[in-house]
């Protein structure tokens, strides 16, 4: 298996050129100028061991050729298709992973066609028509996920896979694993305390356990919660004082109160404008398949409940 992973989170995308830059990684070992010759040599050098590339390997002369093309999108897609077909003929299954795909949502190609639409059509041709690759499109933007899920060109051609927080049992096992790795003594009470603050979000669990090696566990957890509470309070103050005017303060408070006793709610219990605002602010997460809204994390949920206790103080 050969995996190509495009990570775009750290880049700013404003044009097709930015997308091409993110797709490819310069192959320093090749100065080949002909696409066909390079694909043949690259395929020949691939072995049966699992390989992971952060970007598709390409010689600089060929990449320069892409940038010189007016309709570079067509040439780029053709190169990827021919490369994957060549690998497939050798018995190697390419896996194409595109992360944070929402970054290219507003880019249009030279002909005025949205890049995202062309990309989806191309990916469908790789998977459902030619069967030469597996493709995973990742995003942390749940509004974008909803948009993609409802996109007509993907209907019946893509599966929605939710990468969710761990359940409690898995969370406790993950804590045990990290504790052993870090030579940290965690009691059952410690693990229950951690879960009560951060739930099953892996990165939060990892951070807490790493910090607890040098600090008091409850101090670490209390600081994390205070930080989330502070950010939420400041946001509400800006809304109430009209420094943020895109939503009504009363509507936001009403929306947050829906989570006072519930971690998950039906998305239609909240008005669309407030829902989109809270999702964009990374306070809420939308599961478009289940039509469920929930806080971005257990920690955020705890912050919401803490803020609601003193909501009249604003």
Swiss-Prot record:
Disulfide bonds: none
Alphabetically ordered keywords of this record: Plasmid
Pfam families per the UniProt record, alphabetical: ATPase_2, MJ1010-like_2nd
Statement: the UniProt record of this protein carries the keyword Disulfide bond: no
Domain of life per record: Archaea
Gene Ontology MF terms: ATP binding
SUPFAM superfamilies the UniProt entry points to: P-loop containing nucleoside triphosphate hydrolases
InterPro entries recorded: ATPase_dom, MJ1010-like_2nd, P-loop_NTPase, WH-like_DNA-bd_sf
Coiled-coil ranges per UniProt: none
Transmembrane segments: none
Keyword Cytoplasm among UniProt keywords: no
Family, per entry: Belongs to the archaeal ATPase family.
PANTHER family: ATPASE DOMAIN-CONTAINING PROTEIN (PTHR34301:SF8), DNA-BINDING PROTEIN-RELATED (PTHR34301)
Annotated protein name in UniProt: Uncharacterized protein MJECL14
Organism: Methanocaldococcus jannaschii (strain ATCC 43067 / DSM 2661 / JAL-1 / JCM 10045 / NBRC 100440) (Methanococcus jannaschii)
């Amino acid at each position: 298996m050969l995996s190509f992973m495009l990570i775009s989170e750290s880049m700013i995308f404003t044009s097709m050129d930015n997308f091409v830059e993110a797709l490819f990684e310069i192959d320093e070992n090749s100065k080949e100028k002909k696409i066909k010759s390079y694909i043949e040599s690259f395929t020949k050098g691939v072995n049966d061991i699992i390989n992971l590339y952060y970007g598709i390997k390409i010689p600089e002369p060929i990449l320069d050729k892409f940038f010189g093309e007016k309709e570079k999108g067509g040439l780029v897609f053709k190169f990827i298709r021919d490369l994957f077909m060549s690998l497939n003929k050798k018995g190697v299954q390419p896996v194409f992973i595109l992360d944070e795909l929402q970054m290219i949502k507003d880019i249009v190609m030279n002909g005025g066609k949205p890049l995202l639409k062309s990309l989806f059509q191309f990916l469908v041709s790789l998977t459902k028509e030619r069967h030469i690759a597996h493709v995973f499109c990742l995003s942390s933007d749940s509004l974008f996920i909803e948009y993609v899920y409802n996109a007509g060109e993907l209907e019946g051609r893509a599966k929605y896979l939710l990468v969710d927080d761990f359940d409690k049992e898995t969370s406790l096992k993950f804590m045990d694993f990290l504790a052993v790795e870090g030579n940290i003594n965690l009691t059952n009470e410690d693990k229950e305390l951690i879960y009560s603050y951060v739930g099953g979000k892996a990165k939060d669990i990892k951070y807490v356990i790493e910090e607890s090696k040098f600090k008091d566990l409850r101090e670490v957890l209390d600081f994390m919660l205070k930080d989330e509470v502070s950010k939420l309070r400041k946001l509400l103050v800006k809304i109430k004082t009209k420094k943020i005017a895109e939503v009504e303060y009363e509507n936001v408070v009403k929306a947050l109160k829906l989570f006072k006793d519930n971690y998950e709610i039906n998305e239609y219990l909240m008005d669309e404008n407030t829902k989109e605002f809270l999702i964009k602010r990374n306070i809420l997460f939308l599961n478009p398949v289940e039509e469920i809204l929930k806080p971005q994390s257990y920690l955020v949920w705890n912050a919401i409940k803490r803020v609601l206790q003193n909501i009249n103080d604003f």
